[in-house]
Design a protein with these regions (language model features):
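Surface-exposed, charge/polar-rich loops and edge strands
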Residues: 1-170
Length: 170
């Protein structure tokens, strides 16, 4: 799939999230906001920090879209500092830890499209996807997937998640 995307002109950037067991731990709290994530390490090579900064500027000017491949890619991108200029000036890889838990209602700033699995209920990953498209929409998508016999979790089927603005532009 990544080869086909590249053949279609999609540029690939390397980002790394050292995913820990907390990503897969069930949410047991009544309120998603009360769930605590474990810290996970992030690393972005200096050259990719520059490319991400260029993509941020391009998107701000109305051009291009960012496709995150995998839910944890969204967590990684959304954990980055809003401005990457300081990291670029340092000229070194960007390395830090994050405990970001994306939940419905939180803005997703750096991703426009998401290619991901169908995640298990009460997981941090389904909460992340719901932050991307909204709780009502994710419930509808998952109900359709269950009706159609889609496979869930890491080795199951995948979906391309498009924000409402792309499906029904205003």
């Amino acid at each position: 799939l990544l080869s086909r995307l590249a053949a279609g002109g999609v540029e690939r950037l390397g980002i790394e999230l050292q995913v820990g067991p907390g990503t897969f731990r069930s949410v047991e709290c009544e309120r998603l906001e009360d769930h605590r994530m474990d810290f996970e390490g992030i690393r972005v090579r200096a050259r990719d920090v520059e490319r991400l900064h260029a993509q941020d500027r391009h998107r701000a000017g109305g051009g291009g879209r960012t496709l995150a491949v995998g839910s944890t890619s969204v967590r990684t991108l959304e954990s980055l500092p809003p401005s990457l200029e300081e990291a670029i000036a340092a000229g070194s890889d960007l390395e830090f830890a994050t405990d970001l838990m994306l939940v419905p209602g939180m803005p997703v700033r750096r991703c426009d499209l998401l290619l991901t699995n169908f995640h298990l209920p009460r997981s941090t990953l389904i909460a992340l996807v719901a932050a991307f498209v909204g709780l009502d929409r994710i419930k509808s998508l998952y109900a359709m997937a269950a009706r159609e016999g889609y496979r869930f979790f890491s080795y199951g089927d995948a979906m391309l998640v498009l924000p409402e603005a792309i499906i029904a532009p205003r």
